[in-house]
């Protein structure tokens, strides 16, 4: 692996792409620390301390800490992700978008353009909502977060946050085009990884004051390593369906006749299900934080429901697993259509041995996909619920939740695979000598 890594610097284009990627990520991290005008930073920091474990924490994770500081990049890349998901869902119900999706490169460019428009619209709506919300928020000492409330602040905030999101979106596209890896994913990756030094420092502080024993630290490290190993194993795992292409004679040339496979990932839906599940479960707790405390004291049943929906509670974990499994199936059904796959195979003379091309093939693919999606959903549930159980068991902060680990490991694997592909096409030794994990055939 070391010799493979040294080969990176022997390929000028690959070296240039990696340097460009680091440059754009550095620009992004600088922007995270540029504050939005008109904000009382101390009051905002004290407000966010009491909002831990709510939807704000999830948004802050995807913004790389920018939301907590309310910097110009406070919205992060979430509006772009939301717009992409909405477009994917709309392709199922709107025939025009479905046709665009099947038109190849031109259709894809059109959908990307619509996604950009959607990102700007969502950023403006969210920016206005944040501006209104900030005007009504107070710090722990009762101080105002917004220095001068009014329409001038609202308009300035909308323009600033929308421009920030548009710039992040542009950075992501530039990384994808000129750098290495998926730009949007790498921006989220950089935001999560940037918190590591602070998390390690806080853990060390807990250890030095005696709140964490050496055994607890070792157990947490071992569990982290184990979870990362499981994520790597599952994310690289595939179920490979054998595909045979019939021979075709065109003039004097013979086409087809080769054997290949259709790879089905165990976790087709990625990190979208836990994100959706977390958003739904954190919403009631987020709303409750804006409720007057006297009103909550007058209605103890509301407080008991909120306590049972808090991270780490049994009901929370059960609902979390249920929502993850549901969204795994739902998102897989939206993004992977067995009928389209079977139709494309039939069009190019491909078939799965023992099955008739067309409907029978589609039914078989759907059956296999349904089976492996259950395994993938249970795996995602275990990875995401484990941190909350650890928090309750050891009573220590678990700074990197399951969603964060899934994103970090998944993006790292994807980037390494792209670097390896660049090296292998130029006949250099890759980062990994042996082939990747092979899926079970048939």
Question: Model-found features: residue ranges?
Answer:
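N-terminal cationic and glycine-rich segments that engage phosphates or anionic surfaces
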Residues: 1-101, 106-442
């Amino acid at each position: 692996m070391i010799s493979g890594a040294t080969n990176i610097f022997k390929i000028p284009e690959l070296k240039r792409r990696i340097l460009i990627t680091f440059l754009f990520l550095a620009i992004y991290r600088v922007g995270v620390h540029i504050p939005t005008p008109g904000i009382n930073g101390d009051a905002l920091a004290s407000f966010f301390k009491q909002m831990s474990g709510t939807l704000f924490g999830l948004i802050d994770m995807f913004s790389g800490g920018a939301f907590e500081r309310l910097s110009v990049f406070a919205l992060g890349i979430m509006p772009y992700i939301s717009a992409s998901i909405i477009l994917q869902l709309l392709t199922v119900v709107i025939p025009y978008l479905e046709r665009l999706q099947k038109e190849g490169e031109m259709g894809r460019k059109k959908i990307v353009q619509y996604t950009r428009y959607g990102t700007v619209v969502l950023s403006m709506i969210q920016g206005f909502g944040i501006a209104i919300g900030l005007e009504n928020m107070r710090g722990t000492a009762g101080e105002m977060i917004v220095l001068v409330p009014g329409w001038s602040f609202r308009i300035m905030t909308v323009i600033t946050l929308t421009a920030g999101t548009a710039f992040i979106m542009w950075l992501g596209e530039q990384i994808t085009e000129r750098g290495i890896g998926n730009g949007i994913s790498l921006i989220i990756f950089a935001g999560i990884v940037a918190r590591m030094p602070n998390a390690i420092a806080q853990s060390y502080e807990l250890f030095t004051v005696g709140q964490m024993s050496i055994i607890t630290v070792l157990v947490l490290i071992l569990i982290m390593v184990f979870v990362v190993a499981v994520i790597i194993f599952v994310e690289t795992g595939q179920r490979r369906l054998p595909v045979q292409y019939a021979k075709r004679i065109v003039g004097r040339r013979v086409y087809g006749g080769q054997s290949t496979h259709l790879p089905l990932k165990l976790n087709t839906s990625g990190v979208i299900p836990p994100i959706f599940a977390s958003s739904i479960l954190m919403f009631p707790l987020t709303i409750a934080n804006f409720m007057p405390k006297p009103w909550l004291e007058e209605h103890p049943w509301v407080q008991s429901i909120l306590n049972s929906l808090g991270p780490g509670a049994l009901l929370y974990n059960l609902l979390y697993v249920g929502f993850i499994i549901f969204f795994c199936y739902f998102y897989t059904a939206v993004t992977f259509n067995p009928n389209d796959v079977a139709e494309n195979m039939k069009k190019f003379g491909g078939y799965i041995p023992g099955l008739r091309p067309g409907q029978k093939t589609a039914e078989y693919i759907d059956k296999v996909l349904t089976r492996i999606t259950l395994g993938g959903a249970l795996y995602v549930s275990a990875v995401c619920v484990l941190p909350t159980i650890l928090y309750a068991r050891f009573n220590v902060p678990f700074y990197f939740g399951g969603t964060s680990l899934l994103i970090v490991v998944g993006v790292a694997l994807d980037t390494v695979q792209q670097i390896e592909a660049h090296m292998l096409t130029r006949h250099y030794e890759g980062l990994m000598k042996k082939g990747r994990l092979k899926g079970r055939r048939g």
